[in-house]
């Protein structure tokens, strides 16, 4: 699936929230940002959850691959990280049809960029409307 501008900013938000550290193994990737991935718990092909901050974590390439290869381990990690109830909410939301029009994507990108700027300036996640 092709990434768009919103995906790129969302990825930076997720990795910034994690302070450029893998949320699984704890390795730091501030000097090599490409090696830290924005890993979606539920596929980003579902627009309803694609940009939901609860649906993504920062994982190094090794941990991301490990979770891709072992979905059971990944599911257990997700439940430990965000809780079973939140995970079930995300799964239910992913099943809802959600179409985003071109002009809406532009507004989404604008909001995400504002949130990233605020996060980089040290604002709290609650202040910027970012759920973790």
Where on the chain are the PLM-derived regions?
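Extended interaction regions within the primary functional domain
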Residues: 9-10, 41, 60
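Short Cys/His-centered divalent metal-binding micro-motifs
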Residues: 27-30, 56-83
